[in-house]
Amino acid sequence: MQVQQPQQIQQQHLQQQQAQQHQQQQVQQHQQQQQQQQQQQQIYQQIVNQPVNNVHQLPSLQQQQLLEQYDELLKQVSLIRSNVSDFFNSFIEDAKQQQTIVNKEEMKQKLKKSMDLVLGSISSIDKVSKRISSYSFQIASSNFSTQEASWAYSTGIYDNRNIKVQLEIRNENYWRSQTSYKSSLASSNLENKLKDLFPIIFQEDEESSSLSKKRKQISSLTSNSLSTTTITTTTTPSPLFKLPSTPPTLLLSGTISPFYDYFAQIERVIHSIRQESALEIFEIQKQSSGAPKGLFVECPDVFKCLICFGIPNDRKDCFTIDRISFFGVKENFDSLWASSKYNIFKKISENSFEAISYYSANPNGGSILKCILSWIWSFRGLFLEECKGCQDILHLDSPQYMYLPPSFRTFDNYTPYHPSCYQNHLLSCNSFSSSTSSSIQQSPFSPLNK
C-alpha cells in the first residue's frame, strides 16, 4: 500500500498537467481565431474604404494594358491549378501501376519542379495584383469567404425551410417519374396478356370499332329528325366535339346515304397526296383479302400517325376510318391500339375523332381518306404556327395536358387554333351575327318596320 500511494499521486499530477495543457491550447486557439477575425475585418474595411479608380476615365492604351494584366493574372491562376492537379495525378498513376519500389529521388524532383512553378506563379500574381490594386478590389480568398458567407446567409440559401422544400420537390419528381414508368410497363403487359387470353378481340371481324357503330347510330337518329324537303347549309366551321352542322345528301326515302371509300381507290389517293404534300404514306398489315388494315403516315421531322380502317359488314370492298393515333418522330409502337406518351399528340388524337365525323358526313363528292390526309398535312407547322385567336403558340389547355401548341385545325381552311380559343371565336361570331340581325330589325329602313 505504501508503494502504490506515490504512484497514484504521480498519475494525478500527470492528469492535472494534461488538463492544464489542454485548456491552454483551447485558449490559444480561441485567441488565434479572434485575431484572424479581427484581421479579416480590418482587411474588409480597408477594401470598402479603399478608393477605386474609374477605369473608363483612363486613356485607351492604359485600359488595354490593364486588360492584359488581368489576362496575365488569370493565366497564372490557371497554371497553379494545372500544376497542382498534375502533381497529384502523378501520385494516382503510380498507385495504379502498383509499384513495390518507390524512387524517392524522382519523387523529390517532381515535387521540387511543381513547387518552383507554383511559387513562380504566386510571385507573378503578387506583382500583377499590386499593379491593378488601385483599379479593383484586393484579391484574397480569406476576404471572399467572409463576403460569400454573409451573402449566402442573407439570401436564405441555407435556410432549413428552403432545403426542406427542395427535398420535397425532388422526392415528388422522383415519385412521378417512377409512377409514369411503372404504369407504362403495366399497361403494355396488360395489353399483351389480353392478346394472349382474348385473341378474338384483335381479329379482323372485330376491326369495326364501337366508334364507327356510334357514328352510324348518330347518323340514323339525325336522319329521322330531318325532313326530305328542307336542307340547310352553313359555312361556319363546326364547334368542337359535335357533329357537323352541314347535313349530308338525303335520298328520296328520307335516309342518309352512307359515304365509304373503296379499297381500289387507295393507291390513287396516296399518289395524289404525295404530289400535293411531303407526307410519307405506307400500307400496313395486309388482310387475307389483300386489303390493308390501315396506313402509316409520317410528316418528316414533326410527327407520325396510324390510320386504322374498319370494314362495313355489308360492303367488303369499302372501308371507313375508325381511329387516328399520332406519335412523336422517335416514338416506337408495336400495336394499332398504342397511344403516344406526349400530351400534344394525345390531344390531336382526341381531336381526330371530330375530323373523322366531319369528313365522313361531308365528303363533298371526294374521298374521305384524301380529306383526312390533307387535314393531317395541315399539322406540319405544329410547333411553329401561332393560334389565330390568341396569337400565341403555347396556351393552357387543361390541367391534364397543361400548355400545348394549337392542336385544332378548322376543317374548311385548316386555320390553327387552341380548342378554347376556337370556342371563344365561335361565341364571338354568334354574338356578332345576333347583334347585326337585331340592328337590322331596329333600323327604320328595315322592311319589317314598313
Swiss-Prot record:
Query: Which molecular function GO terms apply here?
Result: transcription coactivator activity
From what organism does this protein derive? Dictyostelium discoideum (Social amoeba)
What compartments host this protein? Answer: Nucleus
Does Transcription regulation show up as a keyword for this record?
yes
Report the coiled-coil segments. 15-118
| Disulfide pairings | none
Subunit-structure text: Component of the Mediator complex.
- Highest taxon in the source lineage: Eukaryota
GO BP annotations of the record are:
regulation of transcription by RNA polymerase II; transcription initiation at RNA polymerase II promoter
Q: Which keywords label this protein? A: Activator, Coiled coil, Nucleus, Transcription, Transcription regulation
Gene designation per UniProt: med27
Q: Which GO terms describe its cellular component?
A: mediator complex
Identify this protein by name.
Answer: Putative mediator of RNA polymerase II transcription subunit 27
InterPro entries this protein is in?
Answer: Mediator_Med27
